[in-house]
Amino acid sequence: MNSHVNPGTAADAIPGVSPDPIHPARYPRRVLLAVAGLSPQILTETLYALAQSGSEAFIPNEIYLITTVEGANRARLMLLSEKPGWFHRLRREYALPEIDFPPENIRLIHDAGGTPLDDIRSASDNDAAADSITNLVRELTAATDSALHVSLAGGRKTMGFYLGYAMSLYGRPQDRLSHVLVSSPFESDPQFFYPSRESRVLTTRDGRPVDARDARITLAQIPFVRLRDGLPKHLLTGTQSFTATVNAAQRGMAAPRLVLHSQALRVIAADIEVPMRPAEMAFYLWLAERRQAGLPSVNGVDAKADEILVIYKRLVGPLDGGFERATAALESEGMTKAYFEERKSRINRVLTDTLGPSACQSYLIHSEGARPKTRFGLLGLLPAQIDITAQRAESAKRSPVKSTHRP
């Protein structure tokens, strides 16, 4: 006979103690997310397996299900109705605590026009499923006080793939991914929802009686690569598409390429346009020209202000207000440490925010050497990876992705 589940205190947040990612069950907000096709049983099977997983069981206090119109209808009728209400029966039978799972937490996959999908039949339906799943995972991983457990057990294979990939993109150290393995002959029986504590006889498709009490469910944890820390900030919020998010993660692994359009005042790094003010672009272009020409990195105090002013003037013209202010400051005081550090910090900040912590590394202004002889430059780039052109950006061979970030 299956043992009575006692959640105990392991699944409760400990007052005054910050949650430890090693112990997801101790987070105050614990969320279970699953995808489902026409078999909502995967949710009760997963919840049962989680509750049986030891002294520090991850008992969710919220559940979300993502599915199609028909899948949602089946989930409401079979899980949340008064009868049979298998979700509520599982909670009562195993004395599980309150779990927030209203009908509103059954999220539908919508097409590009906002119409809920009955099924996933076409390439555009696949794209819609990918975006819906990615956006929900992004939403559920936004709160720092939450831990997310995701089940890949249900839905079409593509839905499981997208859910696993979304976890790679947005999963945090405290988040987990799993699959449930149900013993034969229960794994495909539409009457089976979880192993019962008392005897409950089912009839298999071939007419054979079996007892649900004898079923065994194994929770298999699935390790996954976490790429979240390498994503740009703007992809951690909003509703960016699955494809856009994957491309951003991929750019962090590609060979670097920096394009500077001096006449159009555009900086394009890793095929993304990076918004820079003229003062910062002049400073960055100065370092890029030095790197491209094979000149050594520079010491901030020894940097020649007139070289930067020549580039600044070339970018905006002699009558620009910003150029006039920079000229007045640099001609009277020269290149001060404060001016150098401010330009460097602003440039590195906008590069990090736009490209993400991983993809930006090749394009940052890096330092080398110990103080007071520390020198700075675009040390992550080879000269051949820098393209400086005075032509208008329309002549560029590739169209960059326009960033939504603003400095």
Predicted regions and their residues:
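Long, low-complexity, Lys/Arg-enriched
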Residues: 1-148, 161-407
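Conserved SAM-binding loop
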Residues: 152
